[in-house]
Amino acid sequence: MDLISACEQAMNPVGLDAVVARSLCDLKCHPIDGISMATRTLILLVCLLLVAWSHTDKKIVPGPSFCLGLGPLLSYLRFIWTGIGTASNYYNNKYGDIVRVWINGEETLILSRSSAVHHVLKNGNYTSRFGSIQGLSYLGMNERGIIFNNNVTLWKKIRTYFAKALTGPNLQQTVDVCVSSIQAHLDHLDSLGHVDVLNLLRCTVLDISNRLFLNVPLNEKELMLKIQKYFHTWQDVLIKPDIYFKFRWIHHRHKTATQELQDAIKRLVDQKRKNMEQADKLDNINFTAELIFAQNHGELSAENVTQCVLEMVIAAPDTLSLSLFFMLLLLKQNPHVEPQLLQEIDAVVGERQLQNQDLHKLQVMESFIYECLSFHPVVDFTMRRALSDDIIEGYRISKGTNIILNTGRMHRTEFFLKGNQFNLEHFENNVPRPPTFQPFGSGPRACIGKHMAMVMMKSILVTLLSQYSVCTHEGPILDCLPQTNNLSQQPVEHQQAETEHLHMRFLPRQGSSCQTLKDPNL
């Protein structure tokens, strides 16, 4: 779809300082006979211009040709048609680890070089994200919430509420809540022979989020359907052109999907407010309660409170549940890993319930989680926008330039010699430090819930794997599982044939976890 530029190779600046200096010295010390003063002055000016030219940035970023506007159109269509993640991988594979494309007519850089990614993540110049203003307004994210809020001042203010909820006392009670929730959902399974694992994980994670951050009764399955519709709308409208929103008959279903979830969350917030007003004593001030207090004091609008709760509720079911699903598939594709995990679980936890003090001892489990996040991440890129002019790796970046950080590709190509092979040894001795490994990002806009996410994943995996061996119906399927990669990597679920791949068998373990692996029926 792209036209290859004739000037595709980068142009490196030529150091002319020494050459010009010698020339000037020669002219001064050994004047050339017959050359007038005017000619000498002209030569001097030309030399000075050459020096100035040699110090300017002249690198041309590789990428598709502009070609009278056809290049920007074709690159934008690729992003719309194949998805942001898929298109980013395509351009990095074709042009290298720094590529220039266009999205909706705006110049966009795709970076998968670790030093460039690290520069952007750590720099306060890139605390803004890019996306369609009208699309974000549809989602309620335009200058609201935390995920795509580009009002940096308001975003920093709201971030403090999220930080408080995702650390401290809440983090301490997360293990108990996770173990209780996954156990309750396992106990209510209708059949162990045909388990919709992705739905199980989504409902479990939603229940955990509700207990920690909202704590009101809700219908998990009904709310999960609304969350899935909202997420699909999020993917569909994020980089759509403004003309797309001119035709109501085109985007009506998207408007309906977002409104349904927003109304549902608003009802839950209203219920929480009512419970607080009727309570004699508020023993547990959770995330939603803090936001309601902020609204009562005029610090946040009602719409912002609803959006913050919405984003907190959907964040984990959207990403963490899918990460766990991919981990279970990778576990079955790499059968040598399961005995290592079970041996550690038996040694650290035994037959009792997982506790907070056990988490740091689960080193094999931690290596497994990190390797899964590196090998097949749910979200393998990050979107940013330059707030002022900058230079990245010698390339001049103008204010307003869009940036896509292709961390998924970076993880596979920049640190490990065999990054395309699943191997726990990648993380056995020590976790690679930034800028090499960025599963949660870093810097001012890093994932604020990264510590809680690790606690939740460890708690759910330990509780599940200590009781069941999870088996796929048709063998290892992750590589051939139908997936899309737009805003995140998602298995295709809208077709019955693909949905069957999402079901697994849960085989109960008898006695020691390690002993059950020797059972030939497993």
Swiss-Prot record:
Pfam families: p450. The keyword Disulfide bond does not apply. It is a peripheral membrane protein. PROSITE patterns: CYTOCHROME_P450. It is found in: Membrane. One of its GO terms (cellular component) is endoplasmic reticulum. GO terms for biological process: female gonad development; lipid metabolic process; response to estradiol. Its cofactor is heme. This is Aromatase. It comes from Oreochromis niloticus. The gene is cyp19a1.
